[in-house]
Amino acid sequence: MTVPLPDRIEAVFCDVGGPIYSDDNFANAVRRALDEIRAEQGRPPVDPVDFDRIYDRGRAAQSGSLRRALATELLGDESYRDELHRRLAPYWTHPEGTAYPDALEMFRRLHGHVRLAIVANQEAATVDALTRDGFAPYVDVWGISAVVGHEKPSREFFEWALHECGTTPEHTVHIGNRLDTDVRPARALGIGTIWVLRGEAPPDPTPEQLAEADLAVPDLTTVADVILERAAS
């Protein structure tokens, strides 16, 4: 199989929600935070149908702020966006058993062949979850937004990760499940991209969306083979 990725790969960046853990963890945290705020407003809990409609619309579009849309439509004003983020933070965890088995296997196989970096918009507690679930021995660089002070899709976050890995865009691949915060900003820097079609990825991506990534995969089972063919080691 011919894949338009870098001929020589020195580093691999990986998102957390979607590639490693189920995005249900984030969705559940958001629901709890929404219900908490709505209770203070004297309103009933969020209707699951309304939540799913907004969430699925964001998945399909692969653009725009999901938190802003939820704040506007379910809390009555987009100004609640920051408050929603603050409220969901303590609930946004990754319980044991929610990691995808193919993710740990990919990290295990790539360890020692490329530099492996977590590059994700996550809370600091994510490091503890990844450590508990066996990823820590294979991670060379911990790019957790709440810790390093950068968030995707900022150019600065990807540049920070490149610097920490001691490599350049043309020898790097980023793995993520969103176009707007993973594929597009990485490609803008010349980083190779692998789009994982689970979690917040659209259930039925369009041909145009699929064409944005160098490689689109349903899961991580084949990714290690693709990268090892091009690994610098």
Where are these regions (language model features)?
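Asp-based, Mg2+/Mn2+-dependent phosphohydrolase catalytic module
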Residues: 1-12, 82, 104, 108, ...
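N-terminal helical cap/lid subdomain that shapes the substrate entry/recognition surface
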Residues: 2-108, 112, 127-128
